[in-house]
């Protein structure tokens, strides 16, 4: 279904009106009770600007006059229509000796009586119902009791109803001073009345159905509290008027000085409280104290706690199935890979030609390698080491005496077999 446009428009007008009133209150805050001409002129200008914007006051007055004229024209039209189409009312007649005030005016019923209080007939529309014959099946007191609700009662009326309703039953009950909670709840919630029945047993309820002396309803308490309360604007105006004319004017410098003074007073107060609590703690008077204050008052407890700590070390036991992993693990440090300049003093560098002078892998060189290596590969024999490296002079190598009968054919065969067996085992 489409939304109701009229309802929305009406709601928006009310909301706009409330917003305008709120803006006016904010802009004229504290100026309501001022009687000066300038203040009143300012309030009037602000109100006009918020309500009518930038319109000229003459235009506003003219529009209001036009609205009044339209209303008057509508009233005249309604009066003319009523005169043209009004129903014809016959002259009202009553019997001899009857009181005219006991008869309702027929013209008043149609809304056409122009005599007002001078009319000899009654203008009370409830008079007809009062003059009706009573029905034997209806008790008028029931209607009166139904209309007589607790909303219209005062304390005296409430006590009277309670005494009439529960007076005799209270006399028969055992003596107790406890008031029934259902009774109190019904009174507080405005549910009590002539036809109220106690949920705790009706008239057989063992508790009292009477108000204790000096009892005050909650709604009456709230009214008294509301009467004592005053609005924030009135409180500010009252306090301002109580200050008098000889006061210091608030400026930025005075406000900052006041704020600094208040802050220093707060710090001094905290220090005094801390000193007092510290003295109470030393004297054993402070029963409730925080952990932070304990360490502030006695900082040596921090070191004592470290000394009393348990230094027991626990070693993890290794089972029979576990493998002892002795491999060390080092973290990667990026700084190790940064290139740096290294001093070359005391460092020997191999020659580039060492690969070209390397002896070929032939049977001729195996014997020399086994006996100590060739000098061409940069290796030194045991004799060179013993002689201090003096065997090589001017690129020539001294001949080493070799005993040809040292290794016979049988010895070489045994050596080859041992070498073959070693290769297989590896």
From Swiss-Prot:
Gene3D superfamilies: 6.20.400.10, Zinc finger, CCCH-type (4.10.1000.10)
Predominant localisation class: cytoplasm
Example of a GO biological process term: cytokine-mediated signaling pathway
Subcellular localization, as worded in the UniProt entry: Cytoplasm; Nucleus
Zinc finger (C3H1-type): 99-126, 174-212
Compositional bias annotation for Acidic residues: 410-426
GO molecular function: zinc ion binding
Residue ranges with Basic and acidic residues bias: 13-29, 64-74
Induction profile: By erythropoietin.
InterPro entries attached to this UniProt entry: ZC3H15/TMA46_C (IPR032378), Znf_CCCH (IPR000571), Znf_CCCH_sf (IPR036855)
GO CC annotations on file: cytosol; nucleus
Family affiliation: Belongs to the ZC3H15/TMA46 family.
Function: Protects DRG1 from proteolytic degradation. Stimulates DRG1 GTPase activity likely by increasing the affinity for the potassium ions.
SUBUNIT field: Interacts with DRG1; the interaction forms a polysomal DRG1-DFRP1/ZC3H15 complex which provides protein stability to DRG1 possibly by blocking poly-ubiquitination. Associates with microtubules.
PANTHER family: ZINC FINGER CCCH DOMAIN-CONTAINING PROTEIN 15, ZINC FINGER-CONTAINING PROTEIN P48ZNF
Name listed for the protein in its UniProt record: Zinc finger CCCH domain-containing protein 15
């Amino acid at each position: 279904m489409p939304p109701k446009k009229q309802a929305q428009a009406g709601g928006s007008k009310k909301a706009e009106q409330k917003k305008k009133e709120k803006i006016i209150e904010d802009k004229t805050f504290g100026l309501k009770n001022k009687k000066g001409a300038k203040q009143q002129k300012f309030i009037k200008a602000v109100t006009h600007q918020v309500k009518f914007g930038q319109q000229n006051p003459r235009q506003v007055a003219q529009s209001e006059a036009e609205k009044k004229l339209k209303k008057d024209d509508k009233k005249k039209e309604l009066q003319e229509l009523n005169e043209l189409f009004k129903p014809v009312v016959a002259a009202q007649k009553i019997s001899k000796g009857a009181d005219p005030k006991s008869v309702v005016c027929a013209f008043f019923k149609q809304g056409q009586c122009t005599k007002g209080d001078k009319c000899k007939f009654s203008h009370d529309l409830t008079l007809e119902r009062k003059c009706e014959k009573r029905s034997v099946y209806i008790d008028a007191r029931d209607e009166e009791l139904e209309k007589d609700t607790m909303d219209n009662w005062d304390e005296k009326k409430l006590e009277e109803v309670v005494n009439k309703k529960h007076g005799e039953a209270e006399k028969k009950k055992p003596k107790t001073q406890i008031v029934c909670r259902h009774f109190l709840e019904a009174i507080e919630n405005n549910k009590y009345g002539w036809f109220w029945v106690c949920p705790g047993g009706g008239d057989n309820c063992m508790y009292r159905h009477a108000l204790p002396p000096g009892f005050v309803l909650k709604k009456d308490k709230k009214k008294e509290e509301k009467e004592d309360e005053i609005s924030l604007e009135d409180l500010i105006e009252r306090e301002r008027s109580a200050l008098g004319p000889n006061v210091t004017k608030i400026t930025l410098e005075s406000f900052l000085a006041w704020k600094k003074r208040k802050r220093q007073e707060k710090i001094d107060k905290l220090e005094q409280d801390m000193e007092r609590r510290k003295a109470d703690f030393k004297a054993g008077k402070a029963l409730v104290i925080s952990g932070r204050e304990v360490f502030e008052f006695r900082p040596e407890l921090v070191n004592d706690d470290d000394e009393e700590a348990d230094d027991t070390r626990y070693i993890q036991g290794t089972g029979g199935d576990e493998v002892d992993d002795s491999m060390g693990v080092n973290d990667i440090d990026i700084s190790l890979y940064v290139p740096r300049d290294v001093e070359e003093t005391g460092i020997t560098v191999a020659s580039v030609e060492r690969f070209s002078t390397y002896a070929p892998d032939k049977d001729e060189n195996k014997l020399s390698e086994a006996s100590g290596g060739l000098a061409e590969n940069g290796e030194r024999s045991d004799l060179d080491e013993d002689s201090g490296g003096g065997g090589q002079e001017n690129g020539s190598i001294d001949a080493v005496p070799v005993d040809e009968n040292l290794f016979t054919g049988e010895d070489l065969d045994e050596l080859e077999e041992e070498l073959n067996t070693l290769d297989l085992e590896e």
